[in-house]
A protein has these predicted regions:
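Active-site clefts of carbohydrate-active enzymes
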Residues: 230-247, 276-278
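Catalytic alpha-helical scaffold of carbohydrate-active enzymes acting on polysaccharides/glycoconjugates
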Residues: 1-160, 165-232, 250-273, 280-331
Length: 331
């Protein structure tokens, strides 16, 4: 890469992304808070000229229950554990977005589309789990078709995919390519970040990931995008955790991120920051203040090294063009 690149991707999912583990009772405040998070992030990104990929669950494109039901794929996953399926919770969904802020996102998607340098990608239609037992290839293909159609209703042509729970496999990359997807967010290379089933997410794995937010267990996290199975891997560098009350840990967390960004800018490589809007759903102002510090450092790196802010699709198109293949995104 000629210059270092800063990528932000957001897993935009509302309750669909956590319903197998959380409820409205214990996590509803975070989900409701997304109604304020999305406009606040968009304004901040516009103010700082920051590009972002919003990897959006396809079910969020519906504005009413009727529209949601009409958009469902005929073939659905038959998970061994039915509680991980979004379709298991359809009976909970309210009549429309005004009455149900947990499962609908149409107005927020429209708002995103009104801002510059913001890409709508896919987080699959149903928050599909590619590595869980019962998530067949045919069901995944039907899921992506439903996501494609839902996005097309708003004039969106999907170019990027973020796999739910980062469950990636070569087979699912091949199916993604069938639908014209060009970019995916690959996992970090260390063992505790590799793709795995939910039951394999043990305390050791989770503990190492948490510790890596503060200590350099997995190195600098600067990578180069690469062609993998015909798609461009725009690899993850760092999950942006919500703020904590421990000021010393927060300083360490900020240093961990900004030092890795500095390394990427200096080496002309990529730094990819990601999180979920609902991570900012409570303590919004504190989380925005932390993000502003990151963006302040990006501006320094932009001036010093020419570091760029790009969407996943734009990175993919640059890589594909370098390999003599065409791309169409320009963010």
């Amino acid at each position: 890469m000629q210059y270092g690149t800063f990528v932000i991707s957001l897993d935009f999912e509302l309750l669909w992304g956590v319903r197998d583990k959380r409820t409205v009772a214990d996590y509803g405040a975070n989900i409701r808070g997304v109604r304020d998070v999305v406009p606040a992030l968009l304004d901040l990104f516009a103010e700082r000229d920051i590009a972002c990929t919003w990897a959006t669950v396809g079910l969020l494109f519906a504005g009413t229950e009727e529209a949601m039901v009409a958009a469902l794929p005929a073939r659905k996953p038959d998970y061994a554990n039915p509680r991980i399926s979004s379709y298991h919770y359809l009976a909970e969904v309210g009549a429309d977005e005004e009455r149900d802020p947990y499962y609908y996102g149409l107005s927020l998607i429209r708002r995103i589309l009104g801002y510059p340098a913001q890409e709508i990608g896919t987080h699959t239609f149903s928050h599909f789990y590619c590595l869980e037992e019962g998530g067949s290839t045919d069901a995944f293909r039907a899921d992506l078709e439903a996501a494609r159609v839902a996005a097309a209703h708003l004039g969106v042509s999907l170019a990027s995919i973020v796999f739910p729970r980062n469950q990636i496999s070569p087979v699912h990359l091949a199916v993604s390519r069938e639908f014209g997807l060009r970019a995916f967010r690959g996992n970090e290379q260390t063992w505790f970040h590799r793709a795995r089933r939910d039951r394999e997410q043990n305390l050791l794995v989770r503990g190492c990931r948490l510790a890596d937010s503060y200590l350099p267990l997995a190195g600098a996290h600067d990578r180069e995008p690469a062609l993998v199975g015909g798609l461009v891997d725009v690899p993850a560098s760092r999950f942006l955790r919500p703020v904590s009350r421990n000021a010393a840990l927060e300083r360490l967390r900020l240093w961990r991120i900004t030092s890795a960004m500095e390394t990427a800018a200096r080496r002309r490589r990529l730094f990819h920051l990601w999180w979920h809007p609902h991570n900012f759903g409570v303590d919004l102002q504190e989380n925005l203040a932390f993000l502003r510090k990151i963006l302040d450092h990006f501006r320094i790196l932009q001036d010093r090294y020419g570091m760029r802010s790009m969407t996943m699709a734009a990175v993919a198109d640059e890589v594909l063009n370098a390999h003599g293949q065409s791309g169409t995104a320009h963010q």
